[in-house]
Amino acid sequence: MFEGERIALLGRSGSCKSTLLAIANGSLRSEQGEVRWCGASIRSMPRRKRREIGMLWQDLLLVEELSVGQNVNSGALGRHNLIWGLANLLFNVDQSACKHCLQRAGLDADLIERGLIDAPIRQLSGGQRQRVALARLLRQQPQLILADEPIANLDPAIASDLLDHLLNRSPEGQLNCGAKAIVISLHQPELVHRFDRVIGLQEGELVMDQPADQLTPADLSRLYEAG
């Protein structure tokens, strides 16, 4: 992939999109082949280097017992000694950094200033929780973002806004989310025009890899109707 590239990962349910993303971020081992990041295998990569690959899971994995700020702050754990990091997470939330990440994730500024950081995560709506998960990812400062259906079950307006915060680029071509590249799995093929490149899977096999602006309705029909 290239710097600034936005990749959509498409395929029917069961096509192994989530599995591919889990292998790419190192949380699942592949039976064959190798995943390399910046020229090095992620299997032998130091933990801190691997943290350059950030994952936005479909299940969010927010900790209900922690506040919004503590959940967001947990994104920075990989950059510190584990014991120091856990203590910092629980007792010394970086309010300024967390507010900045929440704003970049699209949370309302007035809501943030009214004490959202100290609110229990369980009080938030589904859309707000999705944005908190994105803010936690931004707190990690990843160079590569992998997102597993981040807009599933969201209202269309909220989904579109969340994609804006992930995909929009500066006039110089840099992703505003701070990453060098991003891969997002989708169940909404009508959104591929927002990406640069489309990868299609069928039953775990790569069957499509082409520029998004060259994708045709017939290509999508073959991808989703086969099998």
Model-derived segments and spans:
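Conserved ABC ATPase signature
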Residues: G115, P120-L124, Q128
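Conserved beta-strand-loop-alpha-helix hinge in the C-terminal portion
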Residues: E205-G227
